[in-house]
Amino acid sequence: MNIEEILPELFGEKRVYYCQRCLNHGLREKRKNHKLSCTFRFCQCSNCIMVERRRQLNSRLMQIDGSRDEKPMTTLTMALTCSEEDQMECTSQSETTNESSGEDKDDGKPKERRPNCQRCAQHSVVNRLKGHKRACPFRDCFCAKCQVVVERQKLMADQIKLRRRQKREKNNLNSEREAPIAHSMTPSPIDTVTTTTTPTSETSTPMCLKCAQQVIGYQQLLSLLDPSATLQDPMITLSAVLSACPHKNE
């Protein structure tokens, strides 16, 4: 019996994994045949150090298993050990992009991932992780392999937090870029006022220049002849003359 028959969920679909170092710096490069050409191969930032540390822990697990059994790690144990790392990468990739890199879709629904308990895996026992934490027989195990598993899980949790933070930052950046476009498409209050007041000015009664000059001249002449005379409101007089303007039909 081969590994495909033992764990068909690991080989049921072709998955595409991306370089974790490049993801730390906002790039998406396929992991296959990428190691030697990776731009961040020797990067020593805190995020890339987490990636390297997790790889060291995986190597440490293999060394412990090989030294105890005095034989290479079994295929089953290797698959269970590597599955957690692959599942974490699937989770981090799906958190970073909307494209599903670690899960296939069937009828528009994402395929459910079913991770195994890594503590049990180190003791050659297969148990599904969901609802298993409190009932795990190796919950309080302090063997070297379980201690490495605990440290690796902490690193993986930190990396998932990093991917989620990167996703939030990317979404915020996209929102800031879309905001000016939406604002430019929204009519401003000034334009609205101009649009609403323009018809009013066009429909208002046009002022007759001849009648206005006559009213002003009449008022000036009357003030010269009798300065003590009390005049009514000039605007009322002007509006009365304009309303009876004989030049409207000209």
Curated annotation (Swiss-Prot):
Q: What induces it?
A: Negatively regulated by lin-41 which causes degradation of the mRNA encoding this protein.
- Gene3D superfamilies the UniProt entry points to: DM DNA-binding domain
Any idea what a deletion of this gene does? RNAi-mediated knockdown results in male tail morphology defects.
Recorded superkingdom: Eukaryota
Q: Name one Pfam family in it.
A: DM
Main subcellular location of this protein, as a coarse class = nucleus
Compositional bias annotation for Basic and acidic residues: 102-115, 169-180
Biased composition of type Low complexity is found at: 186-201
Would you tell me the Gene Ontology cellular component terms?
neuronal cell body; nucleus; perikaryon
- Gene Ontology biological process terms, A to Z: axon extension; negative regulation of gene expression; nematode male tail tip morphogenesis; neuron fate determination; positive regulation of nematode male tail tip morphogenesis; positive regulation of transcription by RNA polymerase II; regulation of male mating behavior; regulation of nematode male tail tip morphogenesis
| InterPro entries (alphabetical) | DM_DNA-bd (IPR001275), DM_DNA-bd_sf (IPR036407), DMRT (IPR026607)
Q: Which GO terms describe its molecular function?
A: metal ion binding; sequence-specific DNA binding
Q: In which tissues is it expressed?
A: In males, expressed in the tail tip. Specifically, expressed in 15 male-specific muscles of the tail tip called the diagonal muscles, and also in core body muscles of both males and hermaphrodites. In males, expressed in ray A-neurons. In males, expressed in PHC sensory neurons. In males, it is also expressed in the hindgut, B lineage and somatic gonad. In hermaphrodites, expressed in the anchor cell only.
Listed SUPFAM superfamilies: Cysteine-rich DNA binding domain, (DM domain)
Indicate, by first and last residue, each region the UniProt record lists as having compositional bias (Polar residues).
Answer: 90-100
Q: Where in the cell is it found?
A: Nucleus; Perikaryon
Q: Which residues bind DNA?
A: 19-68, 117-164
Which purpose does this protein serve, as stated in its record? Transcriptional activator which promotes male-specific development. Acts partially redundantly with the transcription factor mab-3 to coordinate tail tip cell fusion and retraction and thereby regulate male tail tip morphogenesis. This is most likely through the regulation of downstream effectors such as eff-1. May also negatively regulate the expression of other proteins implicated in male tail morphogenesis including nhr-25, vav-1 and arl-1 in tail tip cells. In males, plays a role in the development of ray A-neurons by negatively regulating the activity of the transcription factor ast-1.
Q: Which family does it belong to?
A: Belongs to the DMRT family.
Q: Which PANTHER family match?
A: DOUBLESEX AND MAB-3 RELATED TRANSCRIPTION FACTOR DMRT, DOUBLESEX-MAB RELATED 11E
This chain's protein is named Doublesex- and mab-3-related transcription factor dmd-3
Organism, scientific name? Caenorhabditis elegans
